[in-house]
Every structure is written in C-alpha cells, then in structure tokens.
C-alpha cells in the first residue's frame, strides 16, 4: 500500500478504537473453504468482477458451487448502489445474488440523515448513486441548507471538487463517505484511487467532521450477521486488507484475502505489520 492509503486505514482503525489481530495466515486453494464454512460473505468489485463486466476466472463457478451445496451467500460491498440494481448487474455477469443478500454501504445513509437532520446535500459521485440520496429523503443541491457533502465515487471534475471544498470549509460542515475504499484494482493489475482517499484529502484540507459507512466499520457486517443462522461458521472473502480483513476481524469472523488484486504479494508482510492485521486464509483466486 502507498503511504496515504496506509494512513487512511490507520485513521479508520482509530475511529473503531484501535484493535489488532495477528493470526498465522494459511495459504489454501479456494475449494478448501467449502468444508470450513457455512456462510460466505463476499466483497464485490475486485473480488468477483471488475470494470466492464469482467469476471475473474472461477468466480462464477465458485458461487454456483456454494448454491448447489446449500451454503449461505451475502455480498458485503462498499459500492453504494441500490440493491435491486446491483443484483440485476450481477445477473448479467452470471452471478445469481438476490437483493436481500446484498449489504451495501449505502444502506446506512438514512440513519445518518436522521441523526443530523439532513434535508439537502452537495453530491460527489456517479448518477447511479443519486437514488440512495433520494431514497433517504435528501435533496441534491449546489447550496445545501447545511454544509453537508456526500461522496460515493470519484467520477466528478475539478470544479465540483472545488465547490465541495468551499462547502466543507464552512463552520459545522460534515462529509459523509458512502464508499470508504482507498484504492480499487484494475483488470491489468494496476490500482486507482477511489472515494475513500479523496474524502481523506478533503478532511485534511478542510478539517470537517466525517462519517463513514461500510467496510471496515462493523455496522454493515453486524447487519449481515443478523440475517444468517446463529453459530454459523462465517468467512469474509475479499481483496482488501484494510476493509475486508480488518472489518471481519472487528466482528469476530474469519477472513480470506484474495491475493494479487488490491493487495500485492511484495508489500503484504509490511502492510500487515503496519495495520496490525493478517487474514486467516489467503487464496490466489477461485480456480
């Protein structure tokens, strides 16, 4: 991880109360997970699929095998999308994951809206994210009633970013982060900065208050856990140490890192040392 990325995830850890875990990671092949767990929590982007409908080798067959063997599946994603829309997009890629099995970081916006009595906000993100604000009763405005900015992606230009900075420099400002991820993997193996890092920069530049939804924070995991049978053996499978693995550890479930996507082999040991976390299991993919 690059330095700014590490600092962001350390900031998240501080917000959650600074805890750590250091189990000995076991390198296994994906099929070995079948016998170990009853419930599978999956990250979405970078774990099962990537941009343009690209599906990682073996991912569809792995999900299908889970269905055939009666395993429970949940999608725990920081993609702040409507669950029905995301389910339909997944089906187009060959994944049968029902809307009620999807737990998105965007699900928690309504609670923050009520907590802070938000009626309107300035929005940074793609068009598909606007439905979450509408569903939560938030009007999208250039001059919101209160200095509130909601960010869920980095698909905006420099003019919109400057306007967000202006709003967040006002007294009593609040930045709501619907996707806390720092970086996302590309198909070619490179990585791109995403909304978590942009939000972190805004916070440091404007000294605004910040609320984050989604992984690694425990609420999204806890809500998903309530939907599965008690005493189930649960594993979180994802590609990101600072969100998927840390979040799983926070709520006491096992974790499995998909190596080589958002986590490079060459930096793995150092990154684990910095954050104080290692996954229970490591796989190189689903084949």
What are these regions (language model features)?
Residues 1-53, 57-60, 64-74, 87-100, ...:
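Asp-based, Mg2+/Mn2+-dependent phosphohydrolase catalytic module
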Residues 79-83:
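Canonical radical SAM enzyme core domain
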Residues 106:
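Class I S-adenosyl-L-methionine
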């Amino acid at each position: 991880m690059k330095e700014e990325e590490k600092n962001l995830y350390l900031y998240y850890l501080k917000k959650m109360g600074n805890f750590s875990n250091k189990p000995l990671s076991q390198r296994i092949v994906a099929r070995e997970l079948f016998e170990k767990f009853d419930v599978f929590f999956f990250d979405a982007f970078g774990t099962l699929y990537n941009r343009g409908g690209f599906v990682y080798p073996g991912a569809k067959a792995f999900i299908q095998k889970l269905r055939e063997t009666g395993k429970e599946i949940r999608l725990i994603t920081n993609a702040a999308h409507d669950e029905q829309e995301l389910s339909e997009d997944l089906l187009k890629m060959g994944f049968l994951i029902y809307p009620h099995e999807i737990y998105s970081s965007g699900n928690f916006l309504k609670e923050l809206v009520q907590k802070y009595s938000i009626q309107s906000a300035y929005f940074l993100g793609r068009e598909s994210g606007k439905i979450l604000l509408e569903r939560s009763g938030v009007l999208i405005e250039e001059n919101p009633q209160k200095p509130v900015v909601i960010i869920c992606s980095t698909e905006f230009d420099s003019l919109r970013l400057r306007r967000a900075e202006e709003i967040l420099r006002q007294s009593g400002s609040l930045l709501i982060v619907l996707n806390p991820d720092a970086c996302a993997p590309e198909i070619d193996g490179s990585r791109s900065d995403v909304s978590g890092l942009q939000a972190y920069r805004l916070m440091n530049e404007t000294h605004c208050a910040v609320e984050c939804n989604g992984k690694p924070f425990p609420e999204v995991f806890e809500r998903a856990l309530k939907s599965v049978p008690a005493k189930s053996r649960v594993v979180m499978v994802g590609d990101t140490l600072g969100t998927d693995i840390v979040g799983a550890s926070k709520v006491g479930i096992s974790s499995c890192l998909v190596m080589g996507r958002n986590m490079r082999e060459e930096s793995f040991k150092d990154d684990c040392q910095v954050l104080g976390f290692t996954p229970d299991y490591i796989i190189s993919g689903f084949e």
